[in-house]
Each structure stands twice: as structure tokens, then as C-alpha cells.
């Protein structure tokens, strides 16, 4: 048991969240590089670039230079602990889509992590998607570290950025590093806790020219000139006006330690990675419908937070991403697939480095493993060593955009149904079958999602489909006594459909119609989100 406890204590599982173009994918690459997981940190460049980010593995992502699915990457990271001894952590990094149209996949991924890194663009500050994602983190009181990026560009003042984070996101900021200049005048950062100055070298491998001890170091005046005295004055003001780091407040999701840097130049990234390992919590306890599951429990438990089809077109595979919540996984172990009430032997679980995969011999609480899925595993499914648990808090969100699927070749109807069913089970889209017709209606939280579905249907399933507009304003899951739902279907069945799980959904043609229908059927609940169970 002691080795189980120590293995779990080494784990750090986190996601990176940001608004599009804040530099999240670049930061992901550089974290992997500093962790020794990749040899060359390839930037996401123009459409025809030869190299693509490790975490952007789907063909469409490579074309567009945006992340449209969440990638999972695991790597060991050795750092120097406070006592000077080397300490090795196992880092599980979940790269999430930054584009606003892929938020549902991001929301679900945030249920699988124990902490998150929020990337803020120093030029643009807090942006819309950052606000949405932080609110999802807040629902679970997820600890957040902040990385203010692009210090090599002319941006807003650091004090202004911290004020905006506190005002807009309602979270205390505790600066851990402080920038020396900005843009062309950017010379490095001062570490407030360690009293060290880290100088910036835009041409060096790791972005750092030198590290000097102490603000009073005369070497600082020689290198920085007049900027040295400006820095001393600024740090005095910062120490007086800002919050000092409070680990308890950080772990409660009420305070965020803030680091400054330039990911594209590798600067500040290693400090962030060290902080992630030092400050972020190891795997946390998880709620189920019946009890709390502690990570150090001897028996394995885990839940599916994502399903991805065709990660490798050569394999035509579907992988269920499982967050290990407690205990230890061993290759070949027999687990109860709770929703199916069946015991299955898991022989071919894998760990990930984006699309690269390795067969897993063992995994511990906090790790993410991939389980081959032949159509029986769904989002939210639970695997245990026998206990019939159901983990809570894995959401499905009401779509905001709707399309009707139509085929150019009617002979491909079976392939269309299979493709849409699989993509819906992944959570890439939601599929609805209206009770009153044979149509297939798709729902998504962002309009670009339909482009992704069309692209994947064509390239992975050989189906050329057209998505036409559908007169639907919003969707609500129906909850209530079966007799009450039957009454609603009898009166308004033309607006009722079944979702992929076979649950009844009301597809409202307008918000006025929804309000009137709710008034007519007060004993039926119309739900905007559905817990995936």
C-alpha cells in the first residue's frame, strides 16, 4: 500500500485553458520539451507548415492550426525540490480546444483534472472564452495557476492585467514572478519568493541568459542599467499592494499564483512546470452517487470522460479515455463495466503522447488510460473492481445550433447513421431522431463543429453529407413521470426527439414556444444540461 500511496502522490493531472490564440498550444509544446517528452518543439504555423504541434493530431487540426479535440500526454519530470534533492513527478497534461466552438469537449475534459493552467495573452488580457472556462473550473473549485504569455510583445502593464483578472474573473492574484520591462525592453523576471532575477535571452535554448541572486546584487545594475532601480521600486510597490501566495486559498480555487513569460521563446516555462509539480494537488477524491472515492483506496475505479474515434486511420479504432480515480490498474485485470453489468478483461489499455500510443502495463490514480471501445462504452461509463459506482459531475450541454443531415448518395444511409452515432458517442456532436420523422438532426454548442463532423464523415467514414438548417432554437431534456412525458408527446410530439442515449428531448422551434410548452406542462422539467450516467 505504501508504494501505491507514493506513486499516487507523484501524479499531477492538469489541463491548459485559454482563449484562442493566447499561446496555449505553444505552451503545451514547450512544457513537453522541458519535460523531455519531445525532441523538437514544433510551432503551429500557417496551413502549409511542415511541422505541426504534437497535440494537434487530427488532419483538420493540422489544416487549420487550431485544436479541435482534447489530447492527453503523459511524461515524467525531474526537478529539484526545496531541500535540494531531485524529485520526479508523473505529469498528465490534457490539452484542450481553445476555439470557442469546441467548448463542450473542453468542459468535459475539465472533469478529469485536479488543476488547470490559465493562459492569458499580455496584449489582449482576459477574453470571453477564458471567462467561460474559468466558470466551469469554479463549479468544481479547481485550483488554477496563471501564465501571462507574450511578454516579448508590447502589451498591457502587469498591474493592469492582474487588476483585470481579479475584477473580471473574481479570483485573487498572487504574483510569483514579475516582469522586467516588456516588448523590446523585456529583460527577464524577478522571482518574488526566491529573491532571484532570471534574465531573458531570446536566442538561448531555454530562454534564460543567467540567474542572479537578490535585488541588491550589483551585477544587476551592470546588466540592466537604469532598469535595475525601476525594478527595485516596482517590486516594493508590488509587495505592498498584491496578495501573498496562500496555498489553502489556491487549493480552494480562490487564489491563483501568477507567472510571467514568453512561451514561444521558452522563457518562464520551466518555472511554471516546477510550480505545477510543487504547488498543484496530487489526485483528489471524487464524488459518486453513493459515496466519496479516495485516490489511495486499494481497489481500482475510473470513469470515461471522452471517446475518440479513428485516432489512427490505419486502425479504424475508437478509444475511451478513462480517468483513474483510485487504486492501481494492471494490464489484464478484470473490471466491472458498471452500465453494462459485465465483467471485462482489459488487456490492451494504452497511454498517450497525442496520437502516439504505448500499451499500459500499469497506471495509478490521476493517470489517463485509453481503453479500446467496440461500441459498448459511452461517456460517463464507470469501471471498478466490482462495486456498482456512478461518478457525478460529467455534463452534457444543450446545443445552441442545429442542422439536418442529408446525403448526396442515398445508398450511404447506413454509413451515415454509423458515423453520426459514433461521433455523437464521442461528444463531438449530439444526434437527435425526431419521433415524427426519419430525419437525423445534429446539435452542437458551436457552429464550426458541423464542419468538423462533415470533414470526419467524409475522411473517416466515406460519407458525403450536406447539413441543412433546421428550425430549432434550443433543446431541453425532459424529466418527469412517464405518464406526464406521454401527455406532452401526445400534444407536442412533433417537437420531441430521442437523443443518442434514448432519452426524450424537446426541440423548441422558438424560445416563445419553449416558454408556452413549459407553462402547459408544469409537471415536466425542461433541463439545459444532462448528467451523463
Curated annotation (Swiss-Prot):
Annotated CDD domains: RF3 (cd04169), RF3_II (cd03689), RF3_III (cd16259)
Keywords of this entry: Cytoplasm, GTP-binding, Nucleotide-binding, Protein biosynthesis
tr-type G domain residues: 9-284
Subcellular location: Cytoplasm
Ligand binding (GTP): 18-25, 95-99, 149-152
Pfam families: EF-G_D2, GTP_EFTU, RF3_C
GO cellular component, one term: cytosol
InterPro entries reported in the protein's UniProt record: EF-G-like_DII, EFG_III/V, G_TR_CS, P-loop_NTPase, PrfC, RF3_C, RF3_dom_3_sf, RF3_GTP-bd
Keyword GTP-binding: yes
Example GO molecular function: GTPase activity
Alphabetical list of Gene3D superfamilies matching this protein: P-loop containing nucleotide triphosphate hydrolases, Peptide chain release factor 3, domain III
GO terms, biological process: regulation of translational termination
PANTHER family: PEPTIDE CHAIN RELEASE FACTOR RF3
Role according to the record: Increases the formation of ribosomal termination complexes and stimulates activities of RF-1 and RF-2. It binds guanine nucleotides and has strong preference for UGA stop codons. It may interact directly with the ribosome. The stimulation of RF-1 and RF-2 is significantly reduced by GTP and GDP, but not by GMP.
Protein family membership: Belongs to the TRAFAC class translation factor GTPase superfamily. Classic translation factor GTPase family. PrfC subfamily.
NCBIfam families referenced in this protein's UniProt entry, alphabetically: prfC (TIGR00503), PRK00741.1 (NF001964), small_GTP (TIGR00231)
Protein name: Peptide chain release factor 3
Protein species of origin: Cupriavidus pinatubonensis (strain JMP 134 / LMG 1197)
